[in-house]
Amino acid sequence: MNTLPQHYPLRVFYDGQCPVCSREIQRHLRHDRLGHLQAINIAAPDFNATAYGLDAQRVHDVMHIVTSDGQVFTEVDAFICIWRALPQRLDRLIFMTLLRIPPLRKLADLAYRAFAKNRVRLFGGCDSNRCQPARPVR
């Protein structure tokens, strides 16, 4: 993770067709009293990844954050950027501290990748702002 100071606003690219992703971004936006986060739905019909300098396939595979100066953070690093942008709370501070421990960080990276790869299969999808139930896991 880059240790440079944050450059706000952070553009948060999230999958609006993923119920869990949508719920989490809404929760983060509610806590963002200073307006540091700008949520961009990659499932919107007019979304164009290349307009932001991002790879279209990769941005659909994992969460991305782009800082105001163009730095790109993905996966767990993207979550850390969000947590840093929000008012400090004990739970976020604990998560960020634990993620400095290499084995825990590796585990978090693996867990995130598994979630990202299977999010629609596990949690269903949304269409026209209405979420559909998840398909049974077989």
Q: Language-model segments: which ranges?
A:
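Short cysteine/histidine-rich zinc-coordinating motifs and their immediately flanking basic loops
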Residues: 30-34, 138
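Thiol/selenol-based redox catalytic cores and closely related redox-interacting motifs
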Residues: 47-138
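Thiol-based oxidoreductase modules, predominantly thioredoxin-like and allied folds used
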Residues: 34-48
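Short, low-complexity, intrinsically disordered N-terminal peptides in bacterial proteins
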Residues: 1-8, 132-138
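Local sequence-structure signature of Cys/Sec-based thiol-disulfide redox active-site neighborhoods
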Residues: 2-31
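Generic secondary-structure microfeatures
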Residues: 16, 25, 41-43, 67-69
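A structure-centric signal for secondary-structure junctions around beta-strands
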Residues: 7-9, 36, 59-60
